[in-house]
Amino acid sequence: MTSEQNIQTFRDFLTQYNLVAEQCFNSCVNEFGSRTVSGKEESCANNCLDKFLKMTQRVSQRFQEHQLLNAQANGAAIKVENGGKINKIQ
């Protein structure tokens, strides 16, 4: 991975992190009467992050399954195209 790709990957991570932090904060913090985080707010934020992580994991898993199915379908199409013979590429 090049330096530019690393920087872009890090930027994408920070963007996603900030979006999740903002969403969870807006959903969970409703009162600003104290500097401390209440137990309810902390629990809500933990649940919010947990849901996001599970959703991300599930989407990633489905994407991998989709990619595998596409690869298998493409492999079957190549076999049919070649009359069932697989030609070795050199």
UniProtKB/Swiss-Prot annotation:
Domain of life (superkingdom): Eukaryota
Sequence motif Twin CX3C motif, residues: 24-48
Disulphide bridges: C24-C48, C28-C44
Membrane topology category: Peripheral membrane protein
Compartments it resides in: Mitochondrion inner membrane
Disruption phenotype: Worms display a small body size, reduced number of progeny produced and partial embryonic lethality due to defects in import of proteins into mitochondria.
Keywords: Chaperone, Disulfide bond, Membrane, Metal-binding, Mitochondrion, Mitochondrion inner membrane, Protein transport, Translocation, Transport, Zinc
Molecular function GO labels: metal ion binding
Protein name: Mitochondrial import inner membrane translocase subunit Tim9
Source species of the chain: Caenorhabditis elegans
